[in-house]
Amino acid sequence: MKFRLTVLIVFSLCLSNVFADEGMWLLGNLRKNKQTDRVMKELGLQMPVNKIYDPKKPCLADAVVSFGGFCSGVVVSEDGLVFTNHHCGFSSIQQHSSVEHDYLKDGFFARSLEEELPNPELYVRFLLRTEDVTKRVLSAARHAKTETERRVAVDSIMNVISMEVSEKDSTLTGIVDAYYAGNEFWLSVYRDYNDVRLVFAPPSSVGKFGWDTDNWMWPRQTGDFSVFRIYANTKNGPADYSPENVPYHPEYVAPISLDGYKEGSFCMTLGYPGSTERYLSSYGIEEMMNGINQAMIDVRGVKQTIWKREMDRRPDIRIKYASKYDESSNYWKNSIGTNKAIKHLKVLEKKRVAEAELRNWIQSHPEEREKLIRLFSSLELSYSNRRETNRALAYFGESFINGPELVQLALEILNFDFEAEEKLVITRMKKLLEKYDNLDLSIDKEVFAAMLKEYQSKVDKKFLPAMYEKIDTLYNGNIQTYVDSLYATSNITSPKGLKRFLERDTTYNLIEDPAVSLSLDLIVKYYEMNQSISEASEQIEEGERLFNAAMRRMYADRNFYPDANSTMRLSFGTVGGYTPFDGATYDYYTTVKGIFEKVKEHAGDIDFAVQPELLSLLSSGDFGRYANAQGDMNVCFISNNDITGGNSGSAMFNAKGELLGLAFDGNWEAMSSDIVFEPDLQRCIGVDVRYMLFIIEKYGKSAHLIQELKMGR
């Protein structure tokens, strides 16, 4: 009896929403979710939930955007200004940078609308409404006898429902997403704006202060923000870039608070979290640790060492490789922290105890036992059957698909539709040719050789693609000689060579190029490996769905939130510090004093290098209306809001729906947060909006932007 009680308690902690600050909540369910509404009000919320989200009236959610499909942002002016993170705008800033105009290093400040810089591939997405379409989707799959048949039926009806939206209104995009491991389905209707221009970017000494050293760490002093503007046609509708476009006028503008926060202040985030695996089985967690996470750690570590060495040597390479290095290293360090936290916080052990209780519940309920008696044995066997190959696939993807850029170019060429409409072919070819702008062949050759060696050292020889046999037979096993020959003989190592190559009479000549031929071999091997585990993968997909549904039935009175899936979510909690380990306590905010301390502590370290004029400005202490109650300048703060990747740039609002700052990171001690919420440790790191405005007005001398903003009362 004592054991069963202990197990039940642990299970509750692992799988149910028992913490007020846990959860990424669906906006469409807010009105019906009385428990969440009650808890938010108890924590201090001072606005009704229909002011947060209402598909029929302007509301707070109307100011929140998906930024490029990979980050979040918030609209803060009647003329379409958008605040997001510096690291979210980093790729756009990099694309506009050169050695002569180094906006990464020095920042960018548009003095007028005419100086704002277009970004052809960037868009923002507004959520208009959501709709539960579960019954319609599941009805279409009711006759499916296998997981494959179910998936085909579900995918088909999801596409039909999505297309119905754009058929009625070409300016809208409909997307049906799966929730609760495929047990529920919701339609989200969006409107996209494709003309988004760069307005303001602080220097990287502000926006990336601390760089890799401080990434995922607290305390933090990173001014992680950038400013863009949405443009529309003269009717305020979506339009591709045109000089004739005008600033977009939004449905709702987020007001800004200069009052700050204190310990215990209510705080909520609205944004687009990417993905979590809170309900994943222990078998899935173990596979994640030893598969994709470990592959990222090993392979990206090798690749990034080569990139960083050359970036530190040459300014042109630093600019070319800045964005891709930043993206790669972010997930690399995340994987390191996640695996470490899973072990340190005993996530697997807790999950297994929870699963033991679920087994007991199934055994004690005849109707459940009949359906799920083999659930755990099937999951365990299926994960075991694909373990070795799945691990090899993880290393394959990191080493080749995400490895040398010559291979990535070749794969794009193989997938290029030369028979498409001429205008589309020209546009896509232009994008393909632009990739050469950020490619250095000597670096890429070194990366390719390193990837070949790394992959070979990590997998069984049965997983080696055909090129390894070629290296052995034609190049005496010398990988470097093979790589040198490949780059010397391929036509696609330069834009001119690619153009000449593609001007031939037929696309069948494509495979004559050694790089394209190699990539075709890689596709064949990748397909072969995936096919060998397709049955196990189908059984896992079904098993995880049944596992998820069983958990929800077991705790039918609980309020379960679905895993993140890049749809808009609300999370809420309070501002507050935490105790990372015994004997240490971290405060809930940082100030500019911490910048000076780190600059001194890390003297000579480029991660903490700051322009003298910025240090002089900060040391003056003249913070004006942006100062805190003590006359100092807050830089960052933390709350126990529940966030993940994709939440970067999410608006952090106070109890009245006024902007306090932007979420930009999580903390190192709780890096397993995508799998399990740790209430005592997990924190959302945000940049204080007052620091952002100070940098915009005083350092960027852009008071005209401040005048556009709507300040809270």
Where are these regions (language model features)?
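Bacterial Sec-dependent N-terminal signal peptides
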Residues: 1-22
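Terminal presequence/propeptide segments associated with secretion/organelle targeting
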Residues: 17-713
